A protein has these predicted regions:
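Gly/Ser/Thr-rich helix-start
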Residues: 6-7, 91
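Conserved class I S-adenosyl-L-methionine
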Residues: 7-35
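Helix-to-beta-strand junctions that scaffold the AdoMet/dcAdoMet cofactor pocket
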Residues: 2-4
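A conserved pocket-lining segment of Rossmann-fold NAD(P)-dependent short-chain dehydrogenase/reductase
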Residues: 34-42
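Conserved Class I S-adenosyl-L-methionine
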Residues: 42-140
Length: 140
């Protein structure tokens, strides 16, 4: 229960164009696998990655003075396959979508993600832009 004057904050990944790892993963699934794998319908994963729907949702639920900002972050990996492994084991919906692919599709998805991540090699590391966004507001 949030008291009057209390603050709420919600964070989600930024859009797939800016959150390169998420964008690469979902582009690879669409290109080499299937998003239709029998999971229950869910909202658009990136629905709240932009200011308007985020602040409107906060206002619609009774909050005031909504703000929205990007939180820059970079994931650093030593191996271009680390991002795929993290998504396959450290997420919920993306991992379930990956587990439901055929072995051939999974391999093609892994290779496509590796290729996308390889473009972000900096010396001995891969620096993958993975910004999030935070929407916040105040309970009247």
């Amino acid at each position: 229960m949030l008291k009057p004057g209390g603050h709420v904050a919600v964070s989600v990944w930024d859009s797939p164009e800016r959150s390169v790892g998420m964008g690469a993963l979902y582009a690879a699934i669409r290109a080499h696998g299937s998003m239709d794998v029998g999971l229950p319908a869910g909202p658009n994963f990136f629905l709240f990655s932009s200011a308007e729907p985020s602040t409107e949702a906060l206002r619609a639920t009774g909050f005031e003075s909504p703000t929205f900002r990007q939180v820059p972050q970079v994931w650093r990996h030593l191996d271009p396959d680390q991002l795929f492994a993290m998504m396959a084991t450290g997420t919920v919906r993306a991992a379930a979508t990956l587990r439901a692919q055929t072995p051939r599709a999974t391999q093609a998805i892994r290779e496509a993600v590796r290729e996308a991540i390889s473009a972000h090699r900096r010396g001995d590391e891969y620096e993958v832009p993975m910004p999030a966004v935070v929407a916040a507001a105040v309970k009247p």
